[in-house]
Amino acid sequence: VSRGIFSFNQGFDRIILEPVAKQYNKLPEKIKTGTGNFTSNIATLLSIPNFVLQGEFKQASDATFSFAINSTVGILGFGNPARALGFEVQKEDLGQTLGTYGVKGGCYFVLPILGPTTARDAIGMIGDTFMDPFATATWREKEFLSVSGSRPDYIAVKAAGAVDFRGDNVVNFDSLEKNSIDLYAS
């Protein structure tokens, strides 16, 4: 089943994501950097509660200051002045938090579009959706659990993050695909 979903994801990447990412890479560097900064800044909102749950209070504090600085001085996070001040924030999610509490990774499988994961990380993704302040703020109250209840701004930010990541890794993915005997096993 996972190989079949992996093949579907490869087709999705080849037909949609890779061509969009290659066009995205033609944009001026400042736009791409700003997009990456913006989506990373939004993702910081999810890292903060996970740092707290992990007992990493210094990291939570740094992430909070980074978000505040980048959202104001960095104009909604398109700039990253916090980095110049020494704030480097790593991403944390609920799957990692569960791992710090001793929850094992569990079985490996591949999700459509989202890609490879483990049972723990899949549960973490669901929890992250509920913990993500940006998701909560942009979802319609009456349709909280339905994708159709999602506002386009939330979906657009997630899609921009995926395109930015894919754009940054076009060469790496092409090399991996070209040099792998079995891409699924890679």
Region spans (language model):
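Immediate N-terminus of the mature polypeptide
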Residues: 1-21, 162, 182
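Amphipathic, non-membrane alpha-helical segments in soluble helical-bundle scaffolds
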Residues: 2, 28, 32-39, 62, ...
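Membrane interface segments of multi-pass transport proteins and intramembrane proteases
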Residues: 15-33
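Charged/polar positions within long, soluble alpha-helices
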Residues: 17, 77-80, 135
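Mid-length scaffold segments of soluble, non-membrane domains
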Residues: 37, 41-121
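A structured, mid-to-C-terminal "fold-capping" secondary-structure block
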Residues: 102-186
